[in-house]
């Protein structure tokens, strides 16, 4: 049996530069992987069998099934796999769980079926599945550009602690598309925000003032209950709070583990779905 971890991520910066002629948006984003991980187990089988320990996870609505189908078409026609997923990353949370699992599927089947594709080829296949998938082929700290297909590894951040707060807000199935639909001319930026953050990271530091998410204002407008959770996060002791990806997860990053633990425990005592995790370096 082959077992792989699929880590969550947060966007330290997320800029939309413009809308492209092909209908996609040009992105510039610095992404950081986290120690909150799903676990995927692969074993040989005569047919494709996919299952999860989460009753709410549906294979037919996930990128996992699409990743298996795509890789089968490219390399594994007629081959099977018994794939089981232990879900730990909350569904539809903005933490990239579906994309991360899809990347792990491509890597896992590449090993299980002995296809021998190099990482760059797996990243190409990942780009066919979703914008975040190529990043999860390497993880760590990286710059993502284009519509997600261009990923450049960055110096690994010194370990930091992240507290995640997952609001109990019902999100529409087209959450991300809704955020993109609400972008306007003033939402676009030049990429300078990410450049400033990149400069900080290369100097071995992280400036909270350089963190940015273009979707934050839009999300708080479309989903006004987010404001209540942000306020409760502040009451728990956080002082810099950011939106994770397309949300609704909120997070804070700290160098002080004791402070992170205090905030985490304060949130848990209030009955919130919260996680205390650390930043991760590049994947093998």
Curated annotation (Swiss-Prot):
Keywords, sorted A to Z: ATP-binding, Isoprene biosynthesis, Kinase, Nucleotide-binding, Transferase
Reactions accelerated catalytically: 4-CDP-2-C-methyl-D-erythritol + ATP = 4-CDP-2-C-methyl-D-erythritol 2-phosphate + ADP + H(+)
GO molecular function, a single term: 4-(cytidine 5'-diphospho)-2-C-methyl-D-erythritol kinase activity
Residues forming the catalytic site: 9, 132
One BP term from GO: terpenoid biosynthetic process
Binding site for ATP: 90-100
Highest taxon of the lineage: Bacteria
Family annotation (SUPFAM superfamilies): GHMP Kinase, C-terminal domain, Ribosomal protein S5 domain 2-like
InterPro entries recorded: GHMP_kinase_C_dom, GHMP_kinase_C_sf, GHMP_kinase_N_dom, IspE, Ribosomal_Su5_D2-typ_SF, Ribsml_uS5_D2-typ_fold_subgr
Pathway membership, UniProt: Isoprenoid biosynthesis; isopentenyl diphosphate biosynthesis via DXP pathway; isopentenyl diphosphate from 1-deoxy-D-xylulose 5-phosphate: step 3/6
Function of the protein: Catalyzes the phosphorylation of the position 2 hydroxy group of 4-diphosphocytidyl-2C-methyl-D-erythritol.
UniProt record similarity statement: Belongs to the GHMP kinase family. IspE subfamily.
Protein name: 4-diphosphocytidyl-2-C-methyl-D-erythritol kinase
Gene that specifies this protein: ispE
